[in-house]
Amino acid sequence: MLSHANFIFTIFIRRSVNNLRKLVQVLRTDRRVAKKILSAYLNLLSAYPDQPYGHEPIRNPFVPEEDQNVLSAPKDIGSADDLQPKDEVLLDLIDRKLQEGERVIVYTAWVRLDTQERLHKLLTEKGVKAAILDQKVPTVQREEWVDKRVHEGVKVLITNSALVETGLDLNAFTTLIFYNIAFNLYVFRQASRRSWRINQTAPKVEIYMLYYADTMQHKALRLMASKLSAATVIEGQISDEGLAAMSDCQDLTTQLAKEL
């Protein structure tokens, strides 16, 4: 009998986002404004590397005049028709996995971006049969919906990780790729286990996380790594692989106090 293994890999891509950093000065010098825009700022820093176009400006909520309250207007770099560096890595990885006879799940998290439709278009243009599982499919029907698509020959399933975090067996898909992550540790852990069920017969399931180095995506993943490291120690699981290996958590008590 083959022994089963579950592997987690992180893949980083480099990209410059210098044009967003000027907001840091505002956040450091005006606490009142910072409290109002911090969430929008962090979301922008996380999403911009994946989609460097089409973002609304961040405005000072205490200045009513629209022509004077723009704190940062993210510069458009390209358009939806351009292939982004992460797209290239994703498509190469999917191509390799399909050649090995596997099916692939691509998880996306940023609901305000056009990621799912764009990736579906890219895959379709390459002749890959892909499907998008969205929230329009009722929760109780999602597993049946996926099974039907598999029988129809779908090789790549694109969905939001939050839609499959509980209750689904997705054993037909043995490669899981997080194109981006919502940085919710519970959702990540649940979604990453959808293909690693008790009735899984494949010898291995591989999980990949794509991120741009030296960006908010990178920092958030390191934070999640520390949380995952702490969680697995509490549960009695010690791991030096995958996401947990990104953690610089040395002292468990200190890390829990700082980041949980």
Where are these regions (language model features)?
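Conserved Helicase C-terminal RecA-like lobe
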Residues: 1-8, 27-157, 162-168, 238-260
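A structural signal for short hydrophobic/aromatic patches embedded in well-ordered alpha helices
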Residues: 9-13, 17, 145-146, 191
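Phosphate/oxyanion-binding loops and surfaces in catalytic or ligand/nucleic-acid-binding neighborhoods
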Residues: 15-19, 23, 44, 48-55, ...
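Short, glycine/charged-enriched secondary-structure capping and boundary segments
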Residues: 119-123, 146, 171-175, 191-193, ...
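Short, acidic/turn-prone active-site loops that include or flank metal/cofactor-
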Residues: 135-138, 180-185
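Short, well-ordered beta-strand core segments
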Residues: 157, 176-177, 195
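A short beta-strand element within the Helicase C-terminal
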Residues: 168-181, 205-209
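A conserved SF2-helicase RecA2
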Residues: 183-192, 196-260
